[in-house]
Amino acid sequence: MKYKCLVLDHDDTVVDSTASIHYPSLVEFCKIYRPDYHVTLEEYMVLNFEPGIYEYLKDILQLSDEEFDLENEFWNDYVLKHIPHAFKGIKEILEEFKARGGYICVSSHSYKENILRDYKANDLPIPDLIYGWELPQEKRKPATYTLEAIMKELNLKPDELVMVDDLKPGKVMADNAGVDFIGAGWAYDVKAITDYMSKECKLYCKTVEEFKKLILD
């Protein structure tokens, strides 16, 4: 295999979750705390892409620190009650990658405990390392901290890893860490996102099958 370690984003890369969980959670939160604010699913996805979820909540929704904490609790409670499905074919890819001796790690904006729950619920190979939203804000994507921590923990060089993500923060992190990046384009078809990712990503997969061939062939 070309890579010894897959570093996977979680939402809309491994599991189909933004449309079914994260967006509905925000809609319900806004009904209470921002009743005059309305956002479509596509608009929400674009805002997650640029400027990113933290900046979206703080700068666009202008949540106070107290409201930000409330939204975080509201979102996590919603996530705990809803388990997303893994994309068809992902399980087989991860199983084969592990069987060949590869490492599987996660760098995500979801909580570690919820990521682990989703992997278990979908009968996926348990990741070797998981870095999630529990990290301080300055260490989350697009900061390079998680990739650097993975390389240190597993004694790997930058060219032995590949980051797989559907959004820009993962690409920025990988580029800044000198790690290869694969754009995951199989979750949705939002023009603003797919246009950027297909243009800017040297490696971009529209389907899970394309990803399988790239990683395992």
Residue ranges and their predicted role:
Residues 1-4, 112, 116-217:
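Asp-based, Mg2+/Mn2+-dependent phosphohydrolase catalytic module
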